Design a protein with these regions (language model features):
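Bacterial Sec-dependent N-terminal signal peptides
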Residues: 1-42
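Sequence/structural signature of beta-propeller domains
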Residues: 41-377
Length: 377
């Protein structure tokens, strides 16, 4: 029957080399195009725009959270009172570009605790998250290592997240405590971590310990404000030499994706003695708690199996500079989801902290807002 149609059983001795050659060609092509495939999975960076474009004065912006309908709550770490600003941020529905930014108002605690030495809030507000179930916001303070709830008029409600003792003020490297806060409405989880390694977990990356890798604990909380899960997170290795007069390296923010995955921003800023060779590099990684190994406060991170740290996927990296020819230095501390575009793509907003326009002479920092368009994970 086969021969009747002019066909016969293939000779495997003759076809095998052909199949091998075909496999080799496919392998070569896959290796050739792998970098292109990888880059296609990176976020699209639309760059940064100075808030001064919309006549917004310099600030100390350290966290941002979406309130819905193009409104955002923004915290500052150097205000007289703890609380938050409200911004209107409009993005182009097709491109994601920022079209306008308007600073509405500041909502502050009417009875703040103020430092006698500095005249500003002792809370050192660093991270903020909107909590839809109660219509409130939670603010993480690095000065007290607490995460307190505020109503939309900026007044404390008296409630707070039950932070595990391991994150207490006495257990952090000074000024390297809670820097981040996020909430996922889908999974009903709050998320935070310290900026750098806890004292019990090892050395913090920096001039005293060059080339160190920070080992962090990502902590989540339920809607009832109780802690629910903890995960081990290993940062990329920090700078090993040639430090400037100020060096800061740690996780400056966390954002949540609708499906519960997290975006973690690793920020490395190096300020030179003369300022004009300073730079700040930010890397944004995606991690998935649902595919990660849970730990608890008793876990020894230095002895933990490397495979039990969260698996990171880099989605964006960028560096800003302060040089005689390029003065776009930006210390990004806030990050949250922006608007969803008409084609379904999701944007990410980042806001920088200029330290109130810090600088001297003609050189001063600016506050920037930056837009990334996330890849289709």
């Amino acid at each position: 029957m086969v021969k009747a149609f002019g066909l016969s059983k293939p000779n495997l001795l003759h076809t095998q080399p052909h199949n091998n050659m075909k496999s080799k060609i496919l392998l070569a092509l896959s290796l050739l195009f792998m970098p292109l495939i990888s880059s296609a999975q990176q976020a699209v960076d639309l760059g940064q725009v100075a808030l001064s474009k919309w006549r917004i004065g310099t600030g100390n912006y350290s966290g941002i959270a979406s309130l819905g309908n193009n409104r955002y709550a923004v915290v500052s770490d150097k205000e007289i009172t703890d609380g938050f600003f409200t911004f209107l941020i409009d993005q182009n529905a097709t491109t994601g570009a920022i079209e306008s930014v308007y600073l509405e108002s500041f909502k502050g605690n009417s009875s703040p605790k103020v430092s006698a030495a500095t005249g500003i809030s002792v809370r050192d507000c660093e991270g903020i998250a909107y909590f839809p179930p109660a219509g409130t916001v939670f603010i993480a303070g690095e000065g007290d290592q607490k995460i307190l709830e505020y109503n939309m008029n900026g007044q404390p409600t008296g409630r707070e997240l039950t932070v595990p003792k391991i994150f207490g003020l006495g257990n952090i490297v000074p000024n390297y405590g809670f820097e981040s806060l996020a909430y996922c409405p889908t999974t009903h989880r709050f998320w935070t971590t310290t900026e750098s390694t806890l004292l019990k977990d090892g050395n913090a990356a920096g001039p005293m310990h060059p080339g160190e890798q920070n080992l962090l604990r990502l902590q989540s909380f339920r809607d009832d404000l109780l802690p629910i899960a903890q995960y081990a997170y290993r940062m990329d290795r920090g700078k090993a030499d040639d430090f400037g007069k100020i060096y800061v390296y740690g996780v400056s923010e966390i954002a949540t994706l609708p499906d519960g995955r997290l975006l973690v921003m690793e920020r490395e800023a190096d300020i030179s003695n003369g300022y004009l060779s300073s730079q700040c590099t930010c890397k944004i990684f995606m991690v998935n708690p649902q595919e990660s190994w849970m730990i608890d406060s008793s876990t020894d991170l230095q002895k933990l199996d490397p495979n039990k740290f969260m698996t990171k996927r880099l989605i964006a990296t960028f560096t800003t500079h302060m040089t005689p020819f390029k003065q776009n230095f930006a210390n990004y501390e806030g990050m949250c989801l922006g608007r969803q575009l008409n084609d379904g793509r999701q944007t990410l907003l980042l806001i920088s902290d200029s330290q109130g326009g810090y600088g001297k002479g003609p050189v001063h920092l600016k506050d920037y807002i930056r837009v990334l368009i996330l890849p289709d994970f």
